[in-house]
């Protein structure tokens, strides 16, 4: 939808590829890559990712409608292509854990309280520069089964107010925590504070994020401790179920809800299959599993959509993941590049790119036209400084010569 209006179909029906040659150059630093892009020597800001995060403040401004190009970038005629990936990044609960796991109403309330407290919108604004969308659903945008608007809101964590999803209040989180047996973040039986452990890869978290987590969970009296480790150690913990909360992510292999719903299919749980399964939460639900088996063999249509919707509801009701978001990247292309729309799954898209060579050469000359007036101005300034000295020197020499003649 919208491709015709955006001009993405101008080259439809032409023989592929649309360009004869593609040249890749490896830049070791972001700054020279960015500078050359603005000078017109690179057609796009990046291929594997947008390369815009490091230069975000120069490239974008955050306006009332979200992230927009800065005036300088917009004046260049540069095209902005936001790309919401068909994927999901999340922190999941280990459903076998004695504290956060389990399927009683008290355990659900505990997990929901933690979900509400984790302000994903704030997290994305601070640590991802707004490049992400809060996940209300296990299925990302662009995949059948993902719903937008009020119909797509997770009612356990958000409300629909004035045409937008609004996170439920910290007071609600505190109430749920008390009903779960942890008033003010303390075990009602022992009085001990509730302390949770999050396993992450070492490079995926820094002190700023850990301090932020301490603050947001401190609002409901819950203590958090990160346990960073390399991927091999983290994977070993997942395989043995030796985690409480873990970080993970998934990008689509193919555009079907099955490719995400299987993340909670119990035979995929490492503790069930004794394998490298993808259900790292070790979530188990007979109803969910049966629906998943039916979804696998049912063709797309209303019947299958209803099954998928029911599975999404089970995921929400059981509060299997602490938080989730859909990753987003922003790609920039110079004005002579056509067909810049990204494909979320396929990487073989360079054959669709087209270039207006004449415009590229014209813009390069315009943007890199040498500015010579400072040289002339500098020369005049230097001449203006030297000329009085030369004149005075000559006068002095002439005066000395006249005195010599008189003697």
Locations of the language-model features?
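Extracytoplasmic/peripheral linker and loop segments enriched in polar/acidic and small residues
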Residues: 73-77, 84, 108-112, 116, ...
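Short, well-ordered beta-strand elements
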Residues: 19-25, 192-202, 224-226
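Long beta-strand-rich cores associated with HINT superfamily self-processing modules
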Residues: 275, 333-369
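Cytoplasmic C-terminal tails of single-pass
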Residues: 398-407
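Extracellular/periplasmic solute-recognition and catalytic clefts
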Residues: 10, 25-97, 121, 125-127, ...
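Gly/Pro-rich hinge or "lid" segments in bacterial periplasmic/extracellular proteins
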Residues: 1-23, 28-32, 170-171, 175-179, ...
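Structural transition elements
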Residues: 100-101, 133-180, 201-208
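Alpha-helical transmembrane segments
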Residues: 381-395
């Amino acid at each position: 939808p919208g491709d015709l209006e955006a001009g993405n179909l101008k080259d439809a029906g032409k023989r592929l590829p649309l360009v004869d040659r593609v040249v890749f150059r490896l830049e070791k630093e972001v700054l020279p890559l960015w500078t050359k892009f603005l000078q017109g020597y690179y057609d796009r800001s990046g291929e594997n990712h947008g390369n815009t995060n490091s230069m975000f403040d120069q490239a974008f401004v955050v306006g009332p409608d979200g992230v927009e190009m800065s005036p300088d970038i917009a004046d260049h005629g540069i095209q902005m292509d936001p790309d919401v990936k068909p994927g999901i990044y999340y922190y999941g609960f280990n459903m076998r854990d004695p504290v956060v796991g389990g399927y009683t109403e008290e355990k659900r309330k505990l997990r929901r309280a933690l979900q509400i407290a984790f302000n994903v919108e704030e997290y994305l604004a601070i640590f991802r520069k707004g490049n992400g969308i809060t996940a209300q659903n296990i299925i990302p945008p662009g995949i059948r089964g993902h719903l937008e608007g009020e119909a797509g809101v997770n009612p356990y964590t958000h409300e629909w107010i004035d045409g937008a999803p609004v996170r439920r209040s910290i007071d609600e989180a505190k109430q749920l925590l008390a009903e779960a047996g942890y008033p003010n973040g303390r075990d009602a039986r022992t009085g001990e504070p509730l302390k949770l452990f999050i396993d992450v890869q070492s490079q995926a978290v820094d002190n700023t994020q850990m301090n932020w987590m301490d603050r947001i969970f401190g609002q409901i009296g819950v203590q958090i401790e990160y346990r960073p480790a390399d991927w091999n150690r983290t994977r070993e913990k997942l395989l043995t179920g030796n985690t409480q909360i873990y970080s993970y992510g998934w990008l689509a292999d193919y555009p079907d809800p099955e490719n995400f719903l299987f993340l909670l299919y119990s035979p995929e749980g490492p503790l069930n299959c004794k394998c490298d399964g993808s259900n790292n939460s070790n979530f188990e639900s007979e109803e969910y599993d049966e629906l998943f088996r039916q979804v696998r063999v049912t063709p797309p249509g209303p019947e299958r959509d209803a099954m998928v919707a029911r599975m999404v509801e089970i995921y929400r009701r059981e509060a299997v993941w602490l938080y989730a978001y859909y990753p987003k990247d922003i790609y920039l292309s110079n004005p002579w590049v056509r067909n810049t729309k990204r494909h979320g799954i396929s990487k073989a898209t360079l054959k669709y790119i087209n270039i207006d060579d004449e415009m590229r050469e014209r813009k390069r000359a315009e943007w890199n036209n040498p500015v010579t007036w400072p040289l002339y101005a500098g020369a005049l300034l230097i001449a203006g400084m030297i000329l009085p000295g030369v004149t005075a020197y000559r006068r002095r020499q002439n005066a000395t010569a006249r005195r010599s003649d008189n003697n």
